[in-house]
Amino acid sequence: MRSARVGDFDHDRFQQRYKGVRVENGIYTVVSKENTIELMMGEFYQVPENFNSSPKLSESEALSKTLKHIGAKKYIWESVEREAALKRKKNDPNASYFPKGELLVYEHSLGKSNTKKEFRLAYKFGIASIDPPISRYVYVDSNSGEILSSKDARRYEAGGGDTIPTTPPTPPDTNYGICFPDQTPCIKQGSASTRFSGVKTITTYTAGEENHYELKDYSRGKGIITYSWEFIEDPFMGIYLLNVPIVDINNGWTKFEYHDDYNHDALLDAHWGIEMTYDYFKSVHNRLSYDGNDSKVVNNVHYFNIFVGNNAYWDPMTEEIYYIYCPHNSSTCKSLNLPIILDPTYEDFTSLDIVSHEFGHGINGDLAGFTYDPEPGALDEGFSDIWNVGVNNYVNKVLGMQKNIWLVGDETVPGGGMRSVSNPKSTTVMSPGPNTYYGGLWDSENNEAHTNSLVLSHWFYTLSKGKQGINDHWCEYNVSGINIEKAEKIAYAALYYLFPTSGYTSARTAAIYSAKALYGKFSSEVKSTIDAWDAIGVPADTTSRGGQGMYKPHYYITFVKLSNLERSSGNDCGYKDNSYLHPTVIKGFTYNMVLSSEGEVSIPSKVHKWRVWIDFNRNGSFESSEMVVQDSINDTFGGTLQKSIQIPTSALTGDTRMRVSMKAVQSGESYQLANESFTEGEVEDYSITINNFSI
């Protein structure tokens, strides 16, 4: 699918296919360094060998069933204006919103439990309509015509999901006149009195006319376009909604002109906000627009929907941002008498927090393509909040502003903000949430993405600033902060590893490998990244650990010494990734290894059983011949072992893995396996460097 390089690591992304047919969400990423595979992660589906890949229905027949299911009065491709605008946007005379079905292998959930699943050959359609406003992905069984799934395509700022059907139309751009968008004389710098951020410099477009400046910035990529949705009164059609470009006569967008009952100054925030977000990703991450191809970004401000008030979303079908807000002082909005749209809790939805968050969804979708299942959806929202922090930090540094970088939506919700990244459980925000994976306030019932996303954004805060304490699973942590500038690079690079069905454990793995690629695998940045994930309780992707699940064991490793390695620790809650530590040993040499553990009183008493493996042949697995320690401490309170180990002359040189495992069991129970997890005890993983002897 694509290849990319992060630091010294190469990333090759592959799409699973069955007999040439794409398997939905079957994405795999292979990470390598100097032609040696370091990591493979993704989703691989075991499609039955006898699966029939020949459809009975044609694409047009499947589309007919899809449209019958949607039942819209007018679809987006039936709008001449929308089709013309798309052709201009894509610079392609053949571009169209008319849905094209893709035949694919789809894993279909049977029943509401989602536990029983089967594979179906299905057509996938992206459907957008104007009346009613809908934007959905629909999966149709290619044999029976059954609608397997119909999912909302958009990513919302708050709430959202399948209960909110909205997709607005966008009329065509105004006439460019004698001036083309890419000509510098048409591009001007204006002064804008924004609603939330003070007076700011914005880039506008003259259209080749005098006294004519539009909110169109063609100095950044293929353009940033900002429209205002206005209530238009027509003697024949009555009042209807239309989006129009706002024109200023002197490029001085003043508070006197635009701070009115319809909040026209909010358009200036959206326009400036996307400009700053574009600049952030270009300067910090070397990324051009949301898709890396410098594509046009379109703002639709004050879009109205009677089903939902006060929100914003990124629409992946139209690739535009919509800000749903009916200005509370507008006579038209008041006349509608709908409490949902006149909720005094909210200010306008074009603050920099919201703008950067929604733009971030476009980036998340392009790189990882998260589904909106519970954990992928939470990651999508969490990464967008991370970009919100990054953009606010960027304008604070570049423009000397004082944005509150750790509070999401504090300008849109002046009473305390929507979410707190630094203190997710804060009772002063609109939506408190968890600071620990499956901890207090984790939403297990509804799996609300914005709520559970706070675990990811709080990981980012913890990594950036550092933090010490005890999480909701009673696990102690002490994280050294590495600053926002390093943390945001790790977060961005992690998206190259992730895939549509990624969960929190995958995000942990991706971030750790990103830190290794960017700062070196034995760096302090890697240690902090690991410690931050431990702090928020996201478990490592390991085959062996103590304290199964979220259970904190009462028996744990306290000391490991080998060669130049000495590590003392407390209770690490069953598993500790110490791969940033790497004792150095010499082939053929013998070393004294010291191992200590602690435990509690137990009836019957426990025996601390120890095993240590070193992957001498570097094949990625621990074999029985690679076990270098096996012994027990016959004291329930623990103690210390000293063992002599020899590094074989046949060992391969270079960096490899070492696993230290202590299992607390009753006397007579068997020793643990290298890939075994257990209730009481702990596993620690290390790197180890094997060298040849030299004088």
Predicted regions and their residues:
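Segments that shape or occlude catalytic/ligand-binding pockets
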Residues: 1-166, 293-316, 695
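Solvent-exposed, polar/charged alpha-helical surfaces in well-ordered, non-transmembrane soluble domains
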Residues: 38-39, 60-64, 68, 275, ...
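Beta/coil-rich, acidic/histidine-enriched accessory regions frequently appended to metallopeptidases
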Residues: 506-547, 695
